[in-house]
Amino acid sequence: MTLREGLPLFHQQFTALFKKNLLLSWRNKRATCLHLFSSFFFILLIFSIEESSKASDLTSTRHKNVTDPKALVSLPILPCEDKFFVRLPCFDFVWSGNQSRRVTDIVSAIMANNPGRPIPTNKVQSFTKPEEVDAWFMSHPSQVTGALHFVEKNATVISYGIQTNSSSEKKRGRREDPTFKFLVPLQIAAEREIARSLIGDPKFSWDFGFKEFARPAIGGEVIISAFYLMGPVFFLAFSMFGFVLQLGSVVTEKELKLREAMTTMGVYESAYWLSWLIWEGILTFVSSLFLVLFGMMFQFEFFLKNSFVLVFLLFFLFQFNMIGLAFALSSIISKSSSATTVGFLVFLVGFITQIVTTAGFPYSSAYSIGSRVIWSLFPPNTFSAGLQLLLEATSSPGDSGISWSERAICAGGESTCVITTNKIYIWLVGTFFFWFVLALYFDNIIPNASGVRKSIFYFLKPSYWTGKEGNKVEEGSICSCIGSVPPVEHITPEDEDVLEEEILVKQQAMDGRVDPNIAVQIHGLAKTYPGTTKLGCCKCTKTSPFHAVKGLWMNIAKDQLFCLLGPNGAGKTTTISCLTGINPVTGGDAKIYGNSIRSSVGMSNIRKMIGVCPQFDILWDALSSEEHLHLFASIKGLPPSSIKSIAEKLLVDVKLTGSAKIRAGSYSGGMKRRLSVAIALIGDPKLVFLDEPTTGMDPITRRHVWDIIQESKKGRAIILTTHSMEEADILSDRIGIMAKGRLRCIGTSIRLKSRFGTGFVATVSFIENKKDGAPEPLKRFFKERLKVEPTEENKAFMTFVIPHDKEQLLKGFFAELQDRESEFGIADIQLGLATLEEVFLNIARRAELESATVEGTMVTLELESGIAVEIPVGARFVGIPGTENAENPRGLMVEVYWQQDGSGSMCISGHSAEMRIPENVSVIYEPSSQVLGHGQRRVRGIVIDYESNN
C-alpha cells in the first residue's frame, strides 16, 4: 500500500485533525455553548444592572435639565414601617402637651385628616412634657419617625416644635432623606390643624407645597452608566472562558499522551498546530460576532454608534491573541486541571493592568516607547486601551462614535495622542504572532510528557533543517547546571547466547552487511535519564543519573514475533520508546529496515512503517472506535478511498463491529486494548510494537487477539512485551529477557527452558480407585533411580522435577516406569520442560540479587524458628548465622522461594525447611555484620552459591 507524503499528507492530516477538534467540541456541548454564548449572559447582566440603576434614579433629577419643576403638595405622614431599619413595634409619631384639651383635639384632627389614610390610635404615643419624650426615645431607640411638642400659651397662641432623627440611612443603594420624608409632613399637619383650631373652621383649606429651583443638569451632560463602569471588566471575564477552554484542550492532549501517539503515527507538527489554530479561530470569530450582536440587541450606544467592524475586530483580535497566549502557556503547564487556575491568574493580572491602562499608563507622551512596547505584549493591555478609545467616543449623548474612516485619527485631534484604534489593531496582530512563535519555541525546548526536549538553540543547528544525524540528547530541566549524561559502561555479557548475539550484530555492522531478513538491528542502545534537578539558593542540585537501558545488541528478524520480557523497571518500555522515537537515545543506535532512529529523516521514514500499541490506552473518551481508526489512518497517510474498508476490517478482526459507533469512554478495559491493537495494525506496518496488548481481556477475547497476532506475523516483524508467560510461550519465535536495563538471555522458548529451567517436569497420574498409600513405592523408585523427591503430590497425581544432569538416565528410567505402570497404579505419564514462568523468575531473581548486593536492598525472611533473617532481594539459598555446631560446622541454610507481586516486583512466597550447608559450596555474599538486635533473633543472611556447586 502506497502512503501519502508531502503536501497531500499535510492536507489529509489537517482535515482529520480539524474534524477531530470539531467532534470533540460538538460532544462537549456545555463547554462549547459557554464559549459561544456566554457573552449573552454578560451583556444581560450589564443591562440588568444599568436598568436597575435607572429605576433607582427615576425620582432623581440630578442628570436632567429642570426648567419647570412641579410642586409637591399634601404630603402625608407615612407609616412608621416605611422608615429604613425601624424597630418594631413602631409609632408614626409621638407628642407632648396632653394636659391641654385643645392640644389633644388638634392631635386627634392630625390623625383623622392625614391625607391618604387616618392614623390609628395605637400608632401614636402621648406625653405631658418634652423631657418625658426624650426619656422614652432613650429607652425605645429607632421606634418612631418623629415627635411634636405643643404648648398652649393663650386662647390665640399655640406654639409647637418638631423633633426628628436627622441621621440619613442608606438601603439598597437608595438614601433616605429624613427632612422631606418625615419632618415636612409633620410640619404641614401641625400647622394645618392649629390654623383650623384657631379659626374655628374644621374645613378650612390649607394648601402647602414645595419644589426645587429650575436648573440645568448637575455635572454637565456626561452620563456615567453601568456599561461604562463595568463593561471592560465583564468583557475581559467573557474572553477568559474561551481562553481556559483552549488551554485545557491542548494540555489535555499532552497530559494523556494523545499528541505523543499521533507523533508516533507520523503527524506533522504544522498540521497539528494549524488544525487547533483554525478551529479555535472559528470559535473565536463566532463568539465575538455574537457579543457585538447581543450588545446591539440590548441597544447599548457603544455598539450602535461605533463602527460595527471596529468593535468586532477589537474583540476578535483580542480573543485571537489569547489563543496564541494559551498555546504558549500549554507548553509550560503539564496538568489540564491547572488550566482554570492559570485562567484566573491571567484574568486577575489583566484586571489589575486594565485599571492601570485606564488611568493613562503608558499610552501617553509622558511615557517612553519602550514601556509601551513591553506593556503591549500582554494582550489584555492593548484590549483595554482599545476599549477606552471606543468608550470615550460614545460617553456623551452627542457623541457619534468612531467610524471606519476615523480609525487612524486621534480623538479630538490631541497633540499628545500616541495611540489610535488602528494602532491597537496592528499591535494585536503583531502580538499574536509573537505569542504563537513563542508557543512553537516553548513546545520544542520545554520537556514534554516523556521528559524530552530540544536544545534552546535547536533552530540554529543544520541538523534540524536537514534531518541528518547530529542528534544530541536534551532531557529534563533547562537549568544550565545539568551536565552531560555520563556514558554507559560496557559490560561483557555473561550469558553465551547474549554474547553470541552481540558479536554477530557487531560483525554485521563492521562489515556494512545488511541482512534482508532482519527488520530491526540494535547497536549498543543505551538510555540514561539525567535525574531530577532542584533549584536552591544560588545553586542547582540534582540526583544521580539513572541508566534505564545499558547497551543493547540484538537482531529482530522479519516474519517473526520477538517477545521482550522482564520485570517492572527492566527497560522494556524504554527500549520501545527509543525505537519509536518517543525518547531519544543516549548512546548507540538502531536500524529499522535500514533507517537510523538517530536521524530525523530516518525517524520520519520509520514512522511510516511502524504501528504501536502502547502500554496504556491512549484514546479520546469522546470519540468512537471507528472515528479513532479513521483519524489515525488519515494521519498515517492511507489513501482516503481505502480508509473506510480498512477500518471496518480491523473492527471485525478485534470484534468491535457492534461497538464501532460507541464512544471509547464507555468501553471496558479489554475493549480499549483491542482498539489499541487495531490502531497499531493500521496501514499494514512492517514493524509492530505491542506493549502488553492483552492486559484486561477475558480469556476468550485474549485467545482471539492471539490469533490476530499470529496471523499478522507474515510480512512483518512484531515486538511484544507481556507479563503473561503463557502468551509469550505461545506467540513468540524468539524471546529476550531484560533485567536492570540489560539483556540477560535470548533464544527460543525451548532453548531458554533447557538452559535456565530447573530441569524436566514429570507428572504421574494415578488410577482413580488406587488405594491410599500405594504411591510410596513410586516415590522410592524415583528416589533410588534419580535422587528426586516429589515437588507436589496428592491422591490423583505426583509431580517431580528432574535435573538436567539426569538427562542420560531418562530413556531407560521411563522405559522401566512404563513396564511397571500396573504395579504402581499409573494411569498416565507426562514429561516436559520447566515452564517459561520458572525461567523468567530465575533470570529476574538473579538480576535482582546482583543489584541488591551492590545497592544493599534487603527484605526480611521470617523463619519458623522465630529468627528474622535480612537477605538481599533475589537470594535463593541463604545461610543462617548462629546455627553452626559440631554436627553442622558451616551451619544451616534454607531455600527461599520468590514470585512477582501485583506491581511486578520480586517478593518472598515461602521457604524450605532448614538444611545443612554442604562443605563444598562457596559464598556469594556475606554481610560485614551478621547479628542485628538482641538475643540474636534478627540476623543478616549469607547468600550461598548452592546452585553452581549442585
From Swiss-Prot:
The chain crosses the membrane at residues 31-51, 223-243, 276-296, 308-328, 342-362, 426-446. Residues 520-765 form the ABC transporter domain. The keyword ATP-binding applies. InterPro entries: AAA+_ATPase, ABC2_TM, ABC_transporter-like_ATP-bd, ABC_transporter-like_CS, ABCA, ABCA2/9/11_C, P-loop_NTPase. One of its GO terms (biological process) is seed development. Highly expressed in siliques. Detected in seedlings, rosette leaves, stems and flowers. Overexpression of ABCA9 increases seed oil content. It is a multi-pass membrane protein. It comes from the Eukaryota. One of its GO terms (cellular component) is endoplasmic reticulum. GO terms for molecular function: ABC-type transporter activity; ATP binding; ATP hydrolysis activity; fatty acid transmembrane transporter activity. SUPFAM superfamilies: P-loop containing nucleoside triphosphate hydrolases (SSF52540). It is found in: Endoplasmic reticulum membrane. It holds the Pfam family ABC2_membrane_3. ATP binds at residues 566-573. Gene3D superfamilies: P-loop containing nucleotide triphosphate hydrolases. Disruption phenotype: Reduced seed size with abnormal morphology and reduced triacylglycerol content. Retarded growth on medium lacking sucrose. Keywords: ATP-binding, Endoplasmic reticulum, Lipid transport, Membrane, Nucleotide-binding, Transmembrane, Transmembrane helix, Transport. Mediates the transport of acyl-CoAs and/or free fatty acids to the endoplasmic reticulum. Has no effect on the selectivity of fatty acid incorporation into triacylglycerol or further desaturation steps. Belongs to the ABC transporter superfamily. ABCA family. CPR flippase (TC 3.A.1.211) subfamily. This is ABC transporter A family member 9. The lineage of its organism: Eukaryota, Viridiplantae, Streptophyta, Embryophyta, Tracheophyta.
